[in-house]
C-alpha cells in the first residue's frame, strides 16, 4: 500500500495546521523542569484506559497537587471530579514520586529506548504505551502511542498482536515505524495524524 498517497489529503489539509501547532507545543516543553515533567507524567498515568480529555481535566484541576497531596487527598479529589479510577491511580502517582528528580535526565538521554525502559520499570502504572505517550508529550517523537484508536487503524491493514506484553507492543510498533519511515515522518508525529483521522480531534 502506498501510504504517501493514502495520507496526502491529511498531510495537506487542515489537520496539518492543528498537528504542527501541537508538535511545536511539545517541542517547547521545558525538559529541565522536573515538577512540570512529573505533572505531565501524572497526566499519562491518568489517561491510561480512559479518555485523554478526562485526564487533561484532572491535570488542570490538580496541577502541582500531584507533587505533594497525600494518596487519600488525591483519591478524594479524583472521586469528586468523577474520574473513573479514583481508587487505584492515586497510589500510582504517590509511589512514582521517587522518580521526580531523575526525570530531566531520563527525558534527555541519547538512548531513547533506554529512557522508555527506565520509565516502564520505575513509574507505577506505566507500560510501553504510557511511557511513549509521556515522552511524546515532552518532545520525544521516536515512538508510537499504540492506544485503541491507533491499533484499530493498524489492524485494518496488518495483522497485529492483541495483548500488551512488551514483545507484542514492540512488534506492533515495528510495523508502525515502517509506515512512518515510508512517509518520512517520526512515529510520534504520524501517531497524531492517525489519532486525528480516527477521532476528529487532537488533545495530547
From Swiss-Prot:
Swiss-Prot/TrEMBL site (Important for guanine/8-oxoguanine distinction) positions: 204
Indicate the residues that form the catalytic site.
129, 147
Q: Which UniProt keywords apply?
A: DNA damage, DNA repair, Glycosidase, Hydrolase, Lyase, Multifunctional enzyme
Activity as a function of temperature is given as: Optimum temperature is 60 degrees Celsius.
SMART domains registered for this protein in UniProt: ENDO3c
**Reaction catalysed?**
2'-deoxyribonucleotide-(2'-deoxyribose 5'-phosphate)-2'-deoxyribonucleotide-DNA = a 3'-end 2'-deoxyribonucleotide-(2,3-dehydro-2,3-deoxyribose 5'-phosphate)-DNA + a 5'-end 5'-phospho-2'-deoxyribonucleoside-DNA + H(+)
Pfam families (alphabetical) = Ogg-HhH
Q: What is its EC number?
A: 3.2.2.-, 4.2.99.18
According to its UniProt entry, the protein's GO biological process terms are: base-excision repair
Domain of life from the UniProt record: Archaea
Stretches of the chain forming a coiled coil according to its record: none
HAMAP family the record matches: Ogg
The family classification in the record reads:
Belongs to the type-2 OGG1 family.
Q: What does this protein do?
A: Catalyzes the excision of an oxidatively damaged form of guanine (7,8-dihydro-8-oxoguanine = 8-oxoG) from DNA. Also cleaves the DNA backbone at apurinic/apyrimidinic sites (AP sites). Prefers oligomers containing 8-oxoG:C, 8-oxoG:T and 8-oxoG:G base pairs, and is less effective on oligomers containing 8-oxoG:A mispairs.
Protein name (Swiss-Prot/TrEMBL): 8-oxoguanine DNA glycosylase/AP lyase
Q: Which source organism does the UniProt entry give? A: Thermoplasma volcanium (strain ATCC 51530 / DSM 4299 / JCM 9571 / NBRC 15438 / GSS1)
